[in-house]
Amino acid sequence: MSLDVRVIAPNKVIWAKNAEEVILPSQSGMLGILTSHAPLYTALNTGVMKIRNETGWTSIVVMGGFVEVEKNEVLVLVNAGEYVDEIDLSAAKKDVEKALETFNSAEAPKEKEEAAEFLKYAQARLKAVVDK
C-alpha cells in the first residue's frame, strides 16, 4: 500500500504521484508520514520536504503552508515550492542577497514580516542546494 501524495503551490502542481514515505517541516519539527497514518491537519514551516517512492528520495523546498493526511492521501498546500535539483547555486546565492536587502530596507511591520518569510525561503533554497 502506498500514499497518494500531492504537493500544490498557487501556480503549479509540484508533485502528484504515489509515495512510500513523506517527511515535512512542520511547525513543531520534522514530521514523518507513512501509510495508515492517523488523520492529521497541521501548518508547515519553510524548509525541505522529502518524498520517498520506488525510485528513491526527492527533495522539495517549500515556503510554508499546510498538510492534510487522511486515508493514505497526503495533500500539501504550499505558498511556493521547487525541486532542490532544479535550483541553481549562484542564483540561490543572489536570491538570498536580494531578500536580505529587501528585509533590511522594509519599514512597515507587514513589509518586514513578508520580507522575513521570503528571506527564510531564499535561505532554505540555498541550504538545500549546498547540502545535497
From Swiss-Prot:
Q: Name one GO cellular component term.
A: proton-transporting ATP synthase complex
State the membrane topology.
Answer: Peripheral membrane protein
Pfam families annotated for this entry? ATP-synt_DE_N (PF02823)
- Single GO MF descriptor: proton-transporting ATP synthase activity, rotational mechanism
Membrane-crossing residue ranges in chain numbering:
none
The alphabetical list of record keywords is:
ATP synthesis, CF(1), Cyanelle, Hydrogen ion transport, Ion transport, Membrane, Plastid, Thylakoid, Transport
Q: Where found, per UniProt?
A: Plastid, Cyanelle thylakoid membrane
Domain of life where this protein originates:
Eukaryota
Question: Known InterPro entries for this protein?
Answer: ATP_synth_F1_dsu/esu, ATP_synth_F1_dsu/esu_N, ATPsynth_dsu/esu_N
Its biological purpose: Produces ATP from ADP in the presence of a proton gradient across the membrane.
Q: Which family does it belong to?
A: Belongs to the ATPase epsilon chain family.
The subunit structure is: F-type ATPases have 2 components, CF(1) - the catalytic core - and CF(0) - the membrane proton channel. CF(1) has five subunits: alpha(3), beta(3), gamma(1), delta(1), epsilon(1). CF(0) has three main subunits: a, b and c.
Task: Kindly provide the name given to this protein in its UniProt entry.
Answer: ATP synthase epsilon chain, cyanelle
The upper taxonomy is: Eukaryota, Glaucocystophyceae, Cyanophoraceae, Cyanophora
